[in-house]
């Protein structure tokens, strides 16, 4: 028998308060026995994980430091498709690497994730970029780089960021109570395609079809039907 060798992972993050609150991705720190934060001035701190929310892929860390420089937050709702954005992170351990691209789409829902209206970009994101900030050209953080969509496992021009307002809301709830409370309607919906539109007598596909209603849920109590 051989002793287990500790696995070391890397990711990115950014400071949102002068007293050492840091945002990153949940998958960067989940199940970690020890988290070490290295700042751009090369100081290192052992971090405490204040909370992790896997559904939104957001985690909040705290380091014992004061008077730290903090990012400025922007409004992701003001982003326009085609607008330039910039990511900063440490892909493959190459610290403070900057990549740029454009906003490809807003409000994307991924197949395995229905809790975040992702910002889709073509910014190059690689292992180690996760949890790093996505900036607009005003130098404001508008998103948290989270994941890529790829058939090969490598970057193929599809990267996704959590809108910063979503991430900050999750972060505040994690700091306050260690968990996130979400509302729900209790319905399943699907897109209306051409075939469904014709069956309903619509001239063009539009709207959404209520495909299921959770028994006893808010929508059911309000009288919504399939």
Over which residues does each language-model region extend?
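Serine-dependent protease modules
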Residues: 1-222
């Amino acid at each position: 028998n051989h002793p287990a060798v500790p696995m070391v992972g890397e990711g990115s993050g950014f400071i949102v308060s002068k007293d050492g609150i840091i945002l990153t991705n949940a998958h960067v720190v989940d199940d970690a026995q020890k988290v070490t934060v290295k700042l751009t001035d090369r100081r290192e701190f052992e971090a405490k994980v204040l909370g992790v929310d896997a559904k939104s892929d957001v985690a909040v860390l705290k380091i014992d430091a004061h008077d730290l420089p903090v990012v400025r937050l922007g409004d992701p709702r003001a982003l326009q498709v085609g607008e330039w954005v910039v990511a900063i992170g440490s892909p493959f351990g190459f610290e403070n690497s900057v990549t740029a691209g454009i906003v490809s789409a807003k409000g994307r829902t991924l197949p395995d994730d229905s809790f975040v209206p992702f910002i889709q970009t073509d910014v190059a994101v690689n292992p180690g970029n996760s949890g790093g900030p996505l900036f607009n050209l005003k130098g404001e953080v508008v998103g948290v780089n989270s994941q890529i969509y790829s058939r090969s496992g490598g970057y193929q021009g599809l990267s996704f960021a959590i809108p910063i307002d979503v991430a900050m809301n999750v972060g505040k709830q994690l700091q306050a109570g260690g968990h996130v409370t979400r509302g729900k309607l209790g319905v399943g919906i699907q897109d209306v395609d051409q075939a469904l539109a014709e069956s309903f007598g619509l001239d063009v596909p539009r709207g959404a079809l209520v495909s299921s209603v959770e028994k006893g849920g808010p929508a059911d109590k309000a009288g919504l039907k399939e």
